[in-house]
């Protein structure tokens, strides 16, 4: 008898079609070296934008975008709020664990194991990358575009000072949107480009609303892609059973 109720052996049988909704044998599309090179390329591109593109682009947006367009993109920017995604993912994770423990039959075409793994990947990607973004925001302390247009300030302030409007780099809304898009794209590859398009609209809203510079949103999107693909094999892989256990049992063999 299985002594741990929150393991795959307690799950109800599911069809092959439902099990395929989560790619249990997910593998990164690139090697570790390729990811490092892509990260370096992103850092160089962001640096180039900060030197030569960010400010001219922000000035052009300020002069060219109408108030109606600005207000429309404010609504789009709401899709970058991480709170609702965390709440939904947490609810699905709890349902997945309970369904596994009690051997429920899932009324939808998805196993409870897939539900638990997918929702945990969402939570972990938002949490891990969100922490990286927070540390960068506090340490870099980049002035937001608002400070340039009000006081002519373009650059960085004192690290970890928590000064208002010195937390532009990178964009947390863009990170949340791309983190969700990357995870959903991994779980539902056929819809990958739809999710990424929605995330790109959120990133664009941060530029149009003059909340961030181009390098802020570029870096946030890159972090989301990297974190999501690094975590996916360790959460979705069939060889890793910890996602199917309650959090207080993650470290138990």
Model regions: which residues?
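Membrane-interfacial segments
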Residues: 56, 61, 96-107, 139-144, ...
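Membrane-embedded catalytic cores of phosphoryl/pyrophosphoryl-handling enzymes
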Residues: 23-31, 98-99, 152-253
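Residue-level signature of transmembrane alpha-helical entry/exit and packing/kink sites
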Residues: 32-39, 114-122, 217
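Interfacial segments of alpha-helical transmembrane regions
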Residues: 95-96, 102-135
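Alpha-helical membrane-inserting segments
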Residues: 54, 92, 132, 136, ...
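Lipid-exposed faces of alpha-helical membrane segments in multi-pass integral membrane proteins
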Residues: 41-45, 83, 87-94, 124, ...
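Alpha-helical transmembrane segments of integral membrane proteins
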Residues: 75, 86-87, 118-121, 190-197, ...
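N-terminal transmembrane-helix/juxtamembrane module of multi-pass inner/ER membrane proteins
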Residues: 2-93, 138-154, 160, 252-253
């Amino acid at each position: 008898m299985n002594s741990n109720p929150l393991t795959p052996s307690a799950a109800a049988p599911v069809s092959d079609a439902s099990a395929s909704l989560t790619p249990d044998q997910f593998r990164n599309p690139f090697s570790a070296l390729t990811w490092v090179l892509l990260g370096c390329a992103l850092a160089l591109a962001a640096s180039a934008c900060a030197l030569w593109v960010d400010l001219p682009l922000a000035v052009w947006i300020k002069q060219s975008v109408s108030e109606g367009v600005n207000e429309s993109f404010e609504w789009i920017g709401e899709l970058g709020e991480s709170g609702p995604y965390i709440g939904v993912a947490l609810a699905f994770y709890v349902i997945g664990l309970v369904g596994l423990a009690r051997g429920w039959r899932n009324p939808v075409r998805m196993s409870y194991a897939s539900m638990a793994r997918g929702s945990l990947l969402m939570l972990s990607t938002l949490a891990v990358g969100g922490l990286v973004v927070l540390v960068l925001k506090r340490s870099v302390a980049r002035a937001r575009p608002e400070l340039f247009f009000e006081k002519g300030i373009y650059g960085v302030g004192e690290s970890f000072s928590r000064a208002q409007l010195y937390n532009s780099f990178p964009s947390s809304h863009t990170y949340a949107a791309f983190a969700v898009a990357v995870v959903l794209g991994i779980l539902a590859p056929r819809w990958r480009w739809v999710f990424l398009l929605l995330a790109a609209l959120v990133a664009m809203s941060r530029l149009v609303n003059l909340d961030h510079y181009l390098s802020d949103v570029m870096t946030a999107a890159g972090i989301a892609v990297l974190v999501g693909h690094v975590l996916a094999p360790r959460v979705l892989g069939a060889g890793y059973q910890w996602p199917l256990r309650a959090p207080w049992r993650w470290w138990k063999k």
